[in-house]
A protein has these predicted regions:
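Long, charged, low-complexity intrinsically disordered regions
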Residues: 1-80
Length: 80
């Protein structure tokens, strides 16, 4: 069964958000196929932009998918 890990970034700054995402990528089990990053869109785009810029070329990330009116970005992971 494929799993999804959700990470809610509300209330976090860019540094805290990156630390949380990096930790989730490091500890993701082989059955985890997506990290669902909930960054919101009503209070600016800094977190959304950081997620999309930092992780678009990450070696563990196959592609990014936008969800829910740009308030959520899924990191679709590569199989390792």
């Amino acid at each position: 069964m494929q799993s999804i890990i959700e990470i809610d970034l509300h209330g976090k700054n860019r540094y805290q958000a990156k630390v949380a995402i990096d930790a989730a990528l490091r500890r993701a089990r082989p059955d985890v196929m997506r990290l669902r990053i909930i960054h919101g869109c009503n209070n600016g785009t800094a977190l959304r932009d950081m997620v999309r810029e930092e992780y678009a070329g990450h070696p563990k990330v196959r592609r990014l998918e936008s969800r829910l009116g740009n308030g959520v970005t899924d990191l679709v992971l590569r199989e390792f």
